[in-house]
């Protein structure tokens, strides 16, 4: 199965130039340049951990076909990766995001445009760079009888507590309107999501006039995100609920303790959601001890 993953690395000077210009910030020297970027660094840094994503992937997911790497521009291609590896397909934003939404720093816009425009076929996995295949898996963990697997658990309404919940609410309403029927609220799982390319492309094309109004360069309250595709697949009978789908390995790092790293070994897919970077050293220690050797993706 293919994996689609957006990636950004703020240590790339060329990318940072684009970012500061898009923010209408014009530092006069390098010191000012770095100071201007301080409030944004935590969201746009990989904290130097991305190589472990690839090492874990190769060690634990033997049936991988390709990785579709979504990048703003060529300077963002990770220096540790082999550019000639046929399993790595780099897609730059100008290939799939409309001009009016570029430069794009909105992951929802990036993901939805990629799913709609790229030459994806069959079922694929959507990942983030903080999600690791941490124990052996194969395609049977992610699909059954040709349909994507998912874990559905009802919850109360998403509400508008924060921007992410607002985008979930937007997608929930769109899917209800599309199918003209009530739709339960589902727990979201910030881990791998499995989508069927043909179904998702058809759904996005049908609703693109409405969805496109929620696209933009930056995150906004009226965005839509890819989770609406999970909802739509379920309503349409295109996905299969399964307890074996890897959905439990999410770790909210501000609430995480050192002792809990050992728990990560028991999950096939884990997410270390550490956007403020406070646990970077501990996460690196864990990952480097588990995946110390270079993989064949690396130079």
Summary of predicted features, one role per range:
Residues 41, 45, 76-120:
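Active-site-proximal specificity loops/subdomain of glycosyltransferases
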Residues 11-15, 75-80, 132-136, 141-144, ...:
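Short catalytic/ligand-binding loop motif for oxyanion handling, primarily in non-cytosolic enzymes
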Residues 249-299:
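Extended C-terminal regions of large enzymes
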């Amino acid at each position: 199965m293919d994996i689609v993953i957006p990636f950004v690395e703020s240590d790339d000077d060329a990318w940072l130039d684009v970012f500061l210009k898009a923010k209408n910030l014009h530092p006069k020297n390098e010191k000012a340049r770095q100071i201007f970027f301080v409030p944004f660094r935590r969201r746009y840094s990989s904290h130097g951990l991305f190589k472990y994503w690839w090492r874990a992937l190769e060690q634990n997911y033997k049936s991988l076909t390709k990785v579709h790497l979504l990048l703003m521009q060529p300077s963002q291609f990770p220096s540790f990766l082999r550019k000639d590896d046929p399993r790595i397909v780099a897609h730059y934003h100008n290939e799939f995001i409309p001009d009016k939404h570029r430069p794009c720093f909105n992951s929802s816009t990036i993901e939805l445009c990629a799913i709609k425009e790229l030459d994806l076929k069959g079922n694929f996995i959507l990942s983030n760079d903080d999600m690791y295949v941490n124990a052996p898996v194969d395609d049977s963990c992610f699909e059954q009888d040709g349909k994507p697997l998912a874990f559905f658990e009802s919850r109360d309404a998403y509400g508008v507590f924060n921007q992410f919940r607002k985008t979930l609410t937007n997608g929930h309403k769109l899917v209800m309107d599309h199918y003209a029927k009530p739709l339960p609220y589902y727990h979201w799982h910030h881990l791998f999501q499995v989508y069927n390319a043909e179904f998702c492309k058809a759904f996005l094309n049908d609703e693109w006039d409405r969805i496109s109004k929620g696209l933009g360069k930056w995150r906004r309250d009226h965005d839509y995100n890819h989770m609406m595709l999970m909802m739509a697949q379920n309503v349409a009978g295109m996905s299969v609920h399964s307890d074996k789908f890897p959905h439990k390995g999410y770790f909210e790092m501000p609430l995480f303790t050192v002792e809990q790293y050992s728990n990560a070994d028991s999950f096939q897919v884990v997410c270390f959601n550490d956007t403020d970077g406070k646990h970077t050293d501990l996460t690196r220690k864990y990952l480097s001890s588990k995946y110390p050797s270079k993989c064949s993706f690396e130079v």
